[in-house]
From Swiss-Prot:
Protein name: tRNA-specific 2-thiouridylase MnmA
One cellular component term from this protein's GO annotations in UniProt: cytoplasm
Binding site for ATP: G17, M18, S19, G20, G21, V22, D23, S24, M43, G132
Lineage: Bacteria, Pseudomonadati, Pseudomonadota, Gammaproteobacteria, Pseudomonadales
Function, in words: Catalyzes the 2-thiolation of uridine at the wobble position (U34) of tRNA, leading to the formation of s(2)U34.
Amino acid sequence: MRDPAPSNSEMKRVIVGMSGGVDSSVSAVLLMEQGYQVEGLFMKNWEEDDGTEYCTAREDLADAQAVCDRIGIKLHTANFAAEYWDNVFEHFLEEYKAGRTPNPDILCNREIKFKAFLDYALMLGADLIATGHYVRRRDIDGRTELLKGLDPNKDQSYFLHAVGGEQIARTLFPVGELEKPQVRAIAEKHGLATAKKKDSTGICFIGERRFTDFLRQYLPAQPGDIKTTEGEVIGRHSGLMYHTIGQRQGLGIGGLKDASDDPWYVLVKDLDNNELIVGQGNDHPWLFSRALVSSEIYWVNPIDLSSPRKLTAKVRYRQSDQPCTLEKTAGGYRATFDDPQRAVTPGQSVVFYDGEICLGGGVIEIAEPWTSKDKR
């Protein structure tokens, strides 16, 4: 099922969000082949204040311009750095300050790519926008559904779950029907400068810097004790914000007397006492949760939760779908899983699915332990 093509009687104008990567480049090519009137837009969402382009913005803009020149379309540029700071980055810092582990890409999609960019494109006279995300859309019964991308290794519906159906209805996702090797082959065939460009990874505004070094620029470190589940102090941490549930690397502990050689993992971030609770073993019981709570769910389209509903969910990107029961509670929503879930992390997102349909999701606020609380 392809994204809808324009009728012969109506040439629709589409503005593609050109990131300087291969996916958006090929999206523009495919839309041109489908008969759309295509233009590109490069958005800059971060202002470097130290003279170094950590987000490779200059290089990405040059690549986007080279692709647009090659295929003969106009490239607009827009600076959404102020919107990004106000609506994404400040929230990112607040979450870390509160001891949670946020995902800024999800907020960026909701507030920037499918809000600021969409509004700007409509102001330029576009009928639709397009992005290089690996997702699909389907119009059915007067609503627009968000579907998983066909390539399970690249499906990005997890990151778009907070975008509403009205915004999805105004967006085309040309590469959502394809697998990554096909996308690169199309780019090669058309001689695009981005054909062999590596996929971007990590958070754009951090770039190649160490994450801890970046955070220290904005949040003061608050050192505290690292303790075992029995309460023994075995080390010091530089700040809870630098650690996440299930983390193994970078704890600075090991070789302890009377301890086994099993690796140590972060089990709990005790905010009240500024303590990091750790335990040994990848399958430590404290790492597993049976349920989670979220106070607010962003639905692509509203769903009926008048009674508990069997769905599947992901608590992290690229996780396989996990069967669960979702119910509305007085304080929000509770998802109970059929199987124990490892390293459910407050601040991250839980995303719900009904088969290939991405229904929506919310921020995890509480992870309920698989073992009884009195054992913890």
